[in-house]
Amino acid sequence: MRASKFFYKTLREDPKDAEATSHKLLIRASMIKQIASGVYAFLPFGHKVLKKIETVVREEMDRIGGQEMTMSIMMPAEMWKKTGRWELYGDDMIKFKDRKEQDFCLGPTHEEQITTLAGQLISSYKQLPQLVYQIQTKFRDEPRPRFGLIRLREFVMKDAYSFHDSEESLKTTYDQVLNAYKRILERIGLNYEVVAADPGQIGGTLSHEFIVPAEVGESTVFKCDSCGYVATSEVATSVLPAPAFLEKPALEKVHTPDTSSIEDVAEFLQLSKERIIKAVMVIGDSRPYMILVRGDRELDESKMNRRFTQWRMMTDEEILSMGFIPGFVGPREGINEITILKDKSLESLDWGVIGANERDYHIVGVEVSELPFHEIVDLAEVAEGDLCPQCGSPLRSFTGLEVGHIFRLGTRYSEPLEAFYHSEDGERKPFIMGCYGIGVTRLVSAVIEQHHDDFGIVWPWSVAPYHVVIIPIGDVEAQVQELENTLSSAGLDVFVDDRDERPGVKFVDADLIGFPVRLVVNAKKEGKVEIKFRKTGETLLVGQEDVLDTVLRGAVNL
């Protein structure tokens, strides 16, 4: 391919609205162009990267027996209403009416459609298991698209679905896909973590995320470097370090004027926030709850969402109507009308301070073990430095991009959609299902987040738009054509920068775009070719007959 005929335009300055490194470089290197908020066109360079990633994904899915198909993007509301997700997705789903006033959506995911199809096509256990996948554009009306290709309203995703007659069969396929995802990420040059995760709106009994460490990541992950425990913040558990030892004071009601916040109480009593016991009042699934949690911790929203179908904080009026004083709440005698949940964050606390249910008063010296409760729960946020629940070593945290997510769904979709098969004993049973997603467009950004320097993108060999850029200097067209033919015949993608520009401009663009190998053919070098490897910066001067072998040997490390 010749640059003089290529559809691109590089930029010297970062776009003003771009925050993420990958977003800046994708725009500057003419990989993508924004069409609207969260909507991008893939230009030829970016398109080639996208298709190379798709090829890797396709090869690994085919390797484990996946069958590629294409489902419709446009779906009727009925199937979504059967699973309850027409309402659950809310404004994130792009909905519309056709000319007959029938409700439709643009698919954000395809569990409903594939389950309906399976119910129509699979009738016997003899046809199980099945694994199908597609690589397709999805649509979600994100409230705040950001970071270029990281949070989009229109994106390419590989989604796969499996159907089984037993949990054992599901586990086998789940593990096969998990390992396939590992190979995909390794082949495209990514460092990653496989972490226990929250199933979220997809649902199911078990899920894992594939997290690529990155500064602009929207996922927080906690990891123990001693035993390998790793989980996202939504499902992570920990053991809190005990606060510094303090002799327990006598149980006493203490006047604490104008101290309705945890910080105020701690400062007034000259104690750390760890010693304060919060009593958080919520309405969960239409019932009142008091959640006791250590004062230096907040409730984790994802954990609360798993505990309750719907929940919210009580208003001051609601708290008063139940006989409690806002800002000074604590357990009291005879409160049978409310369920008390005691959070695990209190396990490391021997004594503390809690509201006295009287304005401007707290009770000091409360034995935590004697607090009344109905159930012990894990609803508090985990923090860096907490102790690993498996081995007791400190946890560290890092941010990352979720690039893949796999789920054991069970019968979450097959039951409401009445997708059944006949078992070996003739019984009619719902399919046991798994689903498996990997964000193809997000992988483009993830690769750049991990592979760039001050000069631009450093593409791994496997996904580079072109493996080699040839930069001619002087009258060397015959030599360039011969090199181009030799490299192309060996299966390499070759880009010739034949623009009428100074060599320095071409060198800057070569680094920005991120070609793994740069060849400079200079009329003054008497048949020698300068080879520069983008990743290492290594530069060699070799005869033209040695270029192919030198490039292929160097490619092993790119």
From Swiss-Prot:
The keyword Cytoplasm applies. One of its GO terms (biological process) is prolyl-tRNA aminoacylation. It is found in: Cytoplasm. CDD domains: ProRS-INS (cd04334), ProRS_anticodon_short (cd00861), ProRS_core_prok (cd00779). One of its GO terms (molecular function) is aminoacyl-tRNA deacylase activity. InterPro entries: aa-tRNA-synt_IIb, aa-tRNA-synth_II, aa-tRNA-synth_II/BPL/LPL, Anticodon-bd, Anticodon-bd_dom_sf, Pro-tRNA-ligase_IIa, Pro-tRNA-synth_IIa_bac-type, Pro-tRNA-Synthase_IIa_type1. Homodimer. This is Proline--tRNA ligase. It comes from Coprothermobacter proteolyticus (strain ATCC 35245 / DSM 5265 / OCM 4 / BT).
